[in-house]
Amino acid sequence: MPDQQPAADTHDMSWVLNRLTQEKGVLNAVLLSSDGMVLAQSDTVHRDTAERAAASASSLFGLGRSIAELADAPEGQNTPRRVIIDLPEHCILVFSAGHNTALAVAVAAEMTSPEVAVASGATIKAVNGLAPALSARERTAYRSA
């Protein structure tokens, strides 16, 4: 990824998440790195909650890669595109967002509700339109001199 390209780890992308929370039923949104760090969060979520959610969502994607072996998914094609947590009266949607990132969205509605369908569509639209900007650069190891 070129250094000139705006990325989620160098630019504030909270405006994207705040826009998602304007959809009916959407409570919170968190953009996270593949290693579980918060890159951006909606104004509706407390930082501590965002950090726990980012770590958990990252773990879900890791679990998804591991269990993909069950489907004989080849290496490189084993990263989930989305993970859905279906709770009574709530739903958590976690989407692969860009290079090294995911986007978690909490919706106050049942999985089969119109609110979840709209939230899912809005999230997919944001990801498809902004994937390069929702990406994060590879972390580099720093050696002390």
Regions found by a protein language model. Give the residues of each.
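Acidic, low-complexity cytosolic segments
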Residues: P2-V26, D35, L39-A145
